[in-house]
């Protein structure tokens, strides 16, 4: 199968490219930068028009709060151009063609309302600029006459991931870990290899609908810290809980560079995904949450043991 993979220079994109190629597919990669087949900007109409005919599109390209080129101002326009307009143009390019369209979303698109479990039937709501842009993009995908599917990963871990894990590992090395909130709400996570595997299953079955990507279990932040402490071989790590209110204020002042608004909601409430629809495709997550935390902590503690292509920008989606 001939597949166009957007966002191929990113954390998930690199893994998905390897997974799909190993399954025997011809993978054409595209991104704004990095070692890809078709470098270009999907928000450029001319570039999108020139994209080749393919059997499937896996659309993983997106920007978020921690993107390297996030501007200090005009952020709404930035997310609109890179997430919404890019998706609109990509959908227009392949609308009506015999092309299966797979959109990579985020579990932040669910309305974080305190539910103990988020299923593919749970309501969605944009609760920050990022999730609003991803939902706006999803509307174009849902308007396609083509068969289409959406993969919704939760927090993604594994070698190469940084995000919230980097400060936790750095603080643990110093003997004290400070974290916002109580740290006792279960939060789903998923290994990047399992996300790529789910994408492969969706492509292979030409599946339609929504598919959550998460490990079979969920841990809380306190448990993450226990695992990081053990992985680093630390005898004692002090915990320091920070009330969420001042963290929310600081995040707002930094334009949610410190923590995304959606992440703040996740810290205050459970965020656990149901994966029945994904399991029905024959997909099985190979990594439990403890293994994901350990692998990510090990990468951050000993990065030389897990080389990352230096020509590729690290991303956090």
Protein language model annotation of sequence segments:
Residues 85-129, 149:
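Conserved Rossmann-fold NAD(P)-dependent oxidoreductase catalytic core, especially the SDR/UDP-sugar
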Residues 132, 161-167, 181-203, 209-212:
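Substrate-positioning beta->alpha
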Residues 106, 138-159:
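Conserved beta-loop-beta element that borders a ligand/cofactor-binding pocket
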